[in-house]
Amino acid sequence: PTPWTHGRDLWWHDTVTTASPHHHAQPFDAEHPLFILYTSGTTGKPKGILHTTGGYLTQTAYTHHTVFDHKPGHDTYWCTADIGWITGHSYIVYGPLTNRTTQIIYEGTPNSPTEHRHFDIIEKYGVTIYYTAPTLIRTFMKWGRQIPDAHDLSSLRLLGSVGEPINPEAWRWYREVIGAGRTPIVDTWWQTETGAIMISPLPGVTAAKPGAAMTPLPGISARVVDEEGKPVGHGETEANGYLVLDQPWPSMLRGIWGDPQRFHETYWQRFAEQGWYFAGDGAKLDTDADLWILGRVDDVMNISGHRISTAEVESALVAHHTIAEAAVVGATDPTTGQGIVAFVILTAHTQPTPTLIDDLKTQVAHEISPIAKPREIHIVPELPKTRSGKIMRRLLRDIAEGRELGDTSTLVDP
């Protein structure tokens, strides 16, 4: 605990009684620090990301308005994120308040008091825009469609996804079951570091594809390049692309608090010669030049010289009717360099059969390639996740390789 410092620390009840109900806005420099937000790092130690006032407010307001096609006075908007996560900062607090948004703010679990909780809220308040994470969509899938089907969700006109790549199976379920087959889905790519949405379909403009991030927003410049910084060709299927941002954007991070060296090494060193920001994510362009995010580069496995994305293998596993959620890691293998180890959660009421593991391996081989067939598949009740819903593959890799677990401070349930 931090010791009390007289003169610095104040009791809430002592200050609030004398506080004025009126507030007069004060001007600040555009580069005035706005907040520091800690995000999980691949090395285990969280990074303090610094954002500043002017550019951050500009881009959160712009993206909230355009990506969600927000209409003040007509829409009821609900972003389900935790306010302490960047999505909550940008798309519950700053963006919506700037745009005069009528919104739902909910604190609690999606299954308390029952698994109908979110759908009760959508129905009761006539939610029109619903922005959530793939991990929650997969949870809804695991519970079964009979729960959303029991509700009138016809008020919904736009669905959003954030936090990690959404696999095509979950995307289709989200659109068909929650969106009744008629709502656009904006699958948004951005990071704590970028401050606001960078890559996303635009409703009414972009013909979306299940699982694809599609194109950078107007004013944003992104490329997919190989290890040498050369453009990746359209339709190259192996996970050989790196997502880089080659032009500045308003809400970009200004540094890692107290650690300029780590700031340089993490984001700028990889493509220092070109002066590009390296997002740490793998990506590919399909034959239409649409952009697909393949997850963290440290989540790209090298199997017998073939680079295979964890996101692709996870999508292949979840496409099997018995699987609600999957996480895949590359574990050291004496023969192939890395071997694929998968952890899967079964859908509700599914019992494992003697052939299930073999069936799943066959499914992956059929969907991707025999090279992508997992070496091991473990059926588990839960997956380790950060408080923002991201699967902590680093911990799964430690488990797969029999190592001691590293820093678990950002875990939901250490």
Predicted segments, located by residue:
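Conserved pre-ATP/AMP-binding loop-to-beta segment of ANL
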Residues: 4-38, 45, 69-76
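Active-site glycine-centered loops adjacent to acidic/histidine catalytic or metal-binding residues
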Residues: 82, 163, 190, 214, ...
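AMP-binding/adenylate-forming catalytic core of the ANL superfamily
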Residues: 123, 130, 249, 254-255, ...
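Adenylate-forming
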Residues: 46-48, 59-67, 119, 137-144, ...
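Conserved ATP/PPi-binding loop(s) of AMP-dependent carboxylate-activating enzymes
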Residues: 215-219, 230-270, 308, 404
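Conserved S/T- and glycine-rich ATP-binding loop of Class I adenylate-forming
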Residues: 33, 39-42, 64, 77, ...
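Gly/Ser/Thr-rich phosphate-binding loop
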Residues: 77, 94, 98, 128-132, ...
